[in-house]
Every structure is written in structure tokens, then in C-alpha cells.
A protein has these predicted regions:
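Phosphate-binding and adjacent anionic-ligand microenvironments
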Residues: 293-295, 335-336, 340-446
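An N-terminal, well-structured beta->alpha segment
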Residues: 3-109, 116, 198-226, 237
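N-terminal small/polar loop signature for handling phosphorylated ligands or for N-terminal nucleophile
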Residues: 93-156, 252-308
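Short glycine-rich phosphate-binding loop at a beta-alpha junction
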Residues: 90-97, 228-231, 342-348
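Short beta-alpha connecting loops at secondary-structure transitions
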Residues: 158-169, 194-197, 265-272, 308-317, ...
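Gly/Ser/Thr-enriched, mixed-charge loops and adjacent short helices
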Residues: 17, 22, 40-45, 49, ...
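Conserved phosphate/anionic-ligand binding catalytic regions in large, soluble enzymes, centered on
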Residues: 45-65, 149-150, 229, 233-245, ...
């Protein structure tokens, strides 16, 4: 198809959307404004967002190549058809983060599933994606759906799909779902019902928190509270959960960045809410400069990743995802010695230092493809074979960690807790995290 054919196709689809949207529909005004911006119109309609192993992710706006209610509802009808074609009485749990439209898209997703007679649990507040992963198995659901675009800029949102084991779909599932989606029209054949959507039970929250606390390394209270932490949820879903966990382990010597404490879909003080970027810590460093402190801990908007930054020798320093994972592994090996036959699971692009540390402590290393879903798939296999005790630690270089296999996904809440306990432990010996990292480099090389 040449460019003229592509333009014609986009124009035809644009006119179809013009004929269907009413003033009450989302992005109605933006749709009509596209006639004055042909390049943007072309980009919005020349193709469709493609459903894959990460579900959907795209820019918010009108069009087939954007995230909007019509795309979400169509996708969900395809998901419903897939479920009903494979499971007699399916059930789904749905969550969402702090992004623009996330709560609306979560409700629309729930309503389409209910219209198809599917049992639906919907969180009534934003929450970490790890809680969704845990909830899938806790409530014996066949699928989980999370409305999120993780740490992308504010113009994005997305739609992640998890299987009944609590990790993102892999294998043939994405392609099978895509085939069902492609059969659906954006404006017809989509079932919809708002009644019968179930709230997630409070017991799930309590059980999830207990599992997080089981990961604690139980640092002495005096040592723990000698560490001063600045915490930022980067205007995302992690705030209340991380604070609750800090308080539950008896840790009170922390301050939260006020401008980033509560949900803000515009991410006004952190245009790139990504804990892998030093820029994301600017507000936190400002608080550290004025009030003092030892480290900054940040969780991303859906709170499945954690990052750490600090002043080392007077310089603002970001602990990279690889470095933080190495530090966690080193720390755990010293305070919670591995048992025989336990393994570390890492992505193929993760630091080879993992292998050297693991060898010293008798751990085997298993490499997986990039993406924590492949580690999650392994966790599901271990559970199926009653071998979960083989799991010691798992991480990927992009700041995703899991210290115990209580879910099949990475978790920023428990990793934030572990980061604080680890930093407090090393501070008791007069070292910050970079000091300890340099000692590791001296011992193993880098």
C-alpha cells in the first residue's frame, strides 16, 4: 500500500468516526480539530494499535491508533470472545493506575465484560499492578487487566493483560486475542452492562500486605530508623501502599515528596515519571537538600518498579537498575543465606556480576528473555511442580525485582521496603549504597 492509499484509508476511517461520535463522547472536540492537522489525523488513523504480549500502549486521543474508549471497548469485546471460547464461566479482575482516563477505561472494560456475562471484580481505587497480579490467584480469576502505561509520559495510557497465573500473557495467547479483536467493529457488536460488577474484598488487601511483610529482613528498629529516607510515588499508585508497609515494619524516619504524594495524571513535577531517570528525582533531591536525608526511594506510576538515588561524595547519584539488583542480591545473600538448589532468575541483559555473586553463595543462575513476564512464567511452572522453594531472587535491569515468589510479577512495594532495610543495614557499618557497590566491584570485578 503506497502513501496515497494509506492517506485515503485514514481519511475514510476519520470520516467514519466523525459520523459516529456525539458531543458526549470522549475526544469529540479533539476529533473535529484533526481536520486542521492532516499529519496528526494521518497518524491517528493510518493503522490500529496492535495488541501484543504487553497488551496495548499508545497516545491518548481519538482514532484507531490511539488509546480511547472505543479502542478499549473493542479490545475488551475481543478479550471476552477469547475467554468465552476457552473457559466455561470465566472471571476477570481489573485494576488501574493514576493516569488520565485510567479509572474510566477500567469501568468501561468491566462493563463490556459484564455485558458478555463474565464475572468481574473491579478495584474501587488505584493500586499497584502487583496487587492485581496477587488478586488474580487469590480470587481464582482466569485473567487480570490493568489500565496503565507504566512509567511513560502523561500522553500515554495502556491495557495490560495477565493470565490466570498472574503474569503478563505469553506464548500463543496474545495472537489468539488479537485475532478476536480484529473481528470486532469499533461501533457495533460490543456488549455492555454496568450492573453486577463486584468490588474487590478487603481481605485481598490484608493478605497482600502480609505477603509483602513476609519479605522483610527484620532489621533492628534502632538501626532501621537511623536511616533518613525521602520517598516519592511519582504521583502514582504506590504512595499509600509503600507508606503502610514502612509503618508496618516500624519504620517512621521518612518523608514523602508532597508535590508527588497523590495521584496526578499530568505528572506536573515529573514529566518522565521513570525511576530509571535521574531527572525523575529532582523534587525529591530538593526536599533532601532542605531537610536532609540519606537516600531517595521512588516507585513508578503503577508501582511495579523501584529506584534509588542519593548524594555520594556530594554528587547526585542514581543507582542503576542493574546496580540496585546486584546490591539486593548481595544483601539478601548475607542476611538470608540461600538454601541448597535455590536459583536466581535474571533477564539476558542483566549484569554478569549476578553470576559471580551467585556462584559464591551456591546459587544457580537462570537466564530468561527480556521482560519480567518470562520470570513470572517460570514462577508459575515452579508452583505447578511444587518447587517454589527453588526461587531465591529475580530481577531485570529495568528496575524490576521480586525477592520472594508470592506473585508472578515484579513488585515495587516490597522492593521499596527492601531498599530501605538494605540501606539502613549498610549505614550501620558507615557505608552508603555506592560504598557497598564499590566493595562488590573490588571483590568480583565489574
Amino acid at each position: 500500500m503506497d502513501i496515497n492509499e494509506i492517506r485515503k484509508k485514514a481519511e475514510n476511517e476519520y470520516m467514519r468516526w466523525i459520523s459516529h461520535l456525539t458531543p458526549n463522547d470522549e475526544f469529540y472536540e479533539e476529533l473535529h480539530e484533526l481536520k486542521n492537522n492532516p499529519d496528526e489525523c494521518l497518524d491517528s488513523f493510518y493503522s490500529e494499535l496492535t495488541f501484543g504480549t504487553s497488551g496495548l500502549r499508545g497516545i491518548l486521543g481519538p482514532g484507531t491508533n490511539r488509546i480511547n474508549g472505543f479502542v478499549i471497548r473493542r479490545t475488551t469485546q475481543g478479550v471476552a470472545n477469547y475467554l468465552l471460547g476457552n473457559i466455561k464461566k470465566p472471571s476477570v479482575i481489573i485494576g488501574y493506575d493514576s493516569r488520565k482516563g485510567s479509572d474510566f477505561y477500567a469501568r468501561e472494560t468491566a462493563s463490556v465484560l459484564r455485558g458478555n456475562g463474565i464475572k468481574v471484580y473491579l478495584f474501587n481505587e488505584l493500586m499497584p499492578v502487583s496487587l492485581l497480579s496477587y488478586g488474580i490467584k487469590y480470587l481464582s480469576c482466569d485473567m487480570g487487566i490493568m489500565i496503565t502505561a507504566s512509567h511513560n509520559p502523561k500522553i500515554y495510557n495502556g491495557y495490560k493483560v495477565y493470565n490466570n497465573q498472574g503474569h503478563q500473557i505469553v506464548g500463543k495467547d496474545p495472537q489468539s486475542i488479537l485475532k478476536e479483536i480484529e473481528k470486532i467493529d469499533f461501533f457495533s457488536g460490543i456488549k455492555y452492562e454496568t450492573d453486577g460488577i463486584k468490588e474487590v474484598p478487603e481481605a485481598l488487601y490484608r493478605s497482600f500486605t502480609k505477603k509483602i511483610l513476609d519479605i522483610s529482613t527484620n532489621v533492628n528498629q534502632e538501626i532501621l530508623n537511623n536511616l533518613e529516607t525521602i520517598y516519592t510515588p511519582l504521583n502514582g499508585a504506590g504512595g499509600s501502599f509503600v507508606k503502610k508497609v514502612f509503618n508496618s515494619i516500624g519504620y517512621s524516619n521518612y518523608k514523602v515528596v508532597k508535590a508527588q504524594e497523590f495521584p496526578d495524571p499530568d505528572f506536573k513535577t515529573c514529566p518522565q515519571p521513570n525511576p530509571e531517570k535521574l531527572l525523575a528525582y529532582n523534587e525529591a533531591f530538593g526536599l533532601l537538600d532542605s531537610d536532609g536525608g540519606d537516600i531517595i526511594v521512588a516507585t513508578d506510576p503503577d508501582s511495579d518498579r523501584v529506584g534509588v538515588a542519593l548524594y555520594h561524595e556530594g554528587v547526585r547519584t542514581l543507582v542503576t537498575g542493574n546496580q540496585l539488583g546486584i546490591l539486593m542480591l548481595d544483601y539478601l545473600c548475607h542476611v538470608r543465606p540461600p538454601q541448597r538448589n535455590q536459583k536466581v532468575y535474571k533477564s539476558i541483559v542483566t549484569s554478569p556480576l549476578v553470576d559471580k555473586i551467585s556462584k559464591k553463595f551456591g546459587l544457580k543462575v537462570v537466564e530468561k528473555l527480556t521482560g519480567f513476564k518470562y520470570i513470572g512464567e517460570t514462577i508459575a511452572e515452579l508452583e505447578k511442580n511444587n518447587s517454589l522453594n527453588e526461587y531465591y531472587f529475580g530481577f531485570e535491569e529495568s528496575n524490576g525485582y521480586l525477592a520472594k515468589p508470592f506473585i508472578s510479577d515484579k513488585d515495587g512495594v516490597s522492593s521499596a521496603m527492601l531498599s530501605v532495610e538494605m540501606a539502613a543495614f549498610h549505614k550501620a557499618f558507615g557505608k552508603d549504597l555506592i560504598d557497598r557497590l564499590n566493595e562488590i566491584y573490588e571483590e568480583y570485578g565489574n
